[in-house]
Each structure stands twice: as C-alpha cells, then as structure tokens.
Amino acid sequence: MMWKWVTLLLFVLVCGDNPVNAAAHNPFVCCHQKNETAHTPPKKAWSLVNAILHSPSQCNHTNVALAYFNTTKGYKQVSCVNGFGLMSFCLALFDRLLTINVRVADQKFYDELLGYKRGFAAQFSKATTDSSGFKNNLELDLITTRHGRMASKTHVAGLTRSSASSQL
C-alpha cells in the first residue's frame, strides 16, 4: 500500500507541477465559509487534484487547507480540509522517501512545510485547532479525549522546555 503513495508522490515531483502548494499568497476561502454550507468531497484520496495550504498567519493560526477534487461528473469540486492532516501526510511521505534514500526533488516545498509546521506548533492551542467554525469537510480529530472533546494540554515528545519554541 505504501508503494502506491510513494509512486504518486514521485509522479507528482517528476512532472514538475506540484499539486500541493505552500505559499502565503493563496486565497482565504476556507477562513470565511461556515461549515453548514460544506459539501462532502469525494471519498477517494486519488481524486485530489490540487491543494493549497495556508500559512500560520492566515485564518488566525487555525490550520485549514483548500482542496480541489475531480468528480465523476467531470468537474472539479472545491472543499476545505483539515490542514494538519494534509500537511502531516505530505511531510510523512517526504520523510519516508528520505529514509529510503530518495532525494527530495522539491526541497523548497519541503522546507516551507516544515516552517509551517513549526509556526502552527508555536500557536498550538485548543482554540487554534478547532476548525469547526470554518467550512471544513474532512474532519480528522487528531487530538481528542476519550469522549470526543479536544484535549486542553498537549506534549511534543523529545523537546526540552528551552527548545520547545524553536523545534518540533
């Protein structure tokens, strides 16, 4: 199963038209639309055509992303998705490629993702991880308690108090 994701990422990197953008100039569509107007995107990740990750300063440090999906009717559907899930997925793929000695073709993109991760981690709180007020279709409850509520305290393993603000 992992080889399919590695193949997909390699295809995207080789083609040179990266479908996931990490740039500060992207539109803020997901920051302003409420979740009651959301349309459920297609269930298959393979239908993802393009995605825009917002920088930490956008959307009041809440991590939401804009995603474009192909539909069976031949048009593209725009949806807002959980930015933590998408960003973490991309970083995990890059990290996996690096562990098997595959050179990351788009080092600038990888570095921007790491910078965004650090920026979101610096402002990480219960308020900034609650994207329920936005038009957010792919809810991935990454940090929840047993009863489905957001955890009020977090811990990043491997950090000391002095390095917590500069590293992940």
UniProtKB/Swiss-Prot annotation:
Signal peptide as annotated in the record: 1-22
Taxonomic superkingdom: Viruses
Primary location group: virion
Keyword annotations: Fusion of virus membrane with host cell membrane, Fusion of virus membrane with host membrane, Glycoprotein, Host cell membrane, Host Golgi apparatus, Host membrane, Membrane, Signal, Viral envelope protein, Viral penetration into host cytoplasm, Virion, Virus entry into host cell
Region (Interaction with gH): 25-138
Topology in membrane: Peripheral membrane protein
Gene Ontology CC, one term: membrane
Compartments, as annotated in UniProt: Virion membrane; Host cell membrane; Host Golgi apparatus, Host trans-Golgi network
HAMAP family linked: HSV_GL_alphagamma
Subunit-level organization: Interacts with glycoprotein H (gH); this interaction is necessary for the correct processing and cell surface expression of gH. The heterodimer gH/gL seems to interact with gB trimers during fusion.
Purpose: The heterodimer glycoprotein H-glycoprotein L is required for the fusion of viral and plasma membranes leading to virus entry into the host cell. Acts as a functional inhibitor of gH and maintains gH in an inhibited form. Upon binding to host integrins, gL dissociates from gH leading to activation of the viral fusion glycoproteins gB and gH.
Name listed for the protein in its UniProt record: Envelope glycoprotein L
Taxonomic source organism: Alcelaphine herpesvirus 1 (strain C500)
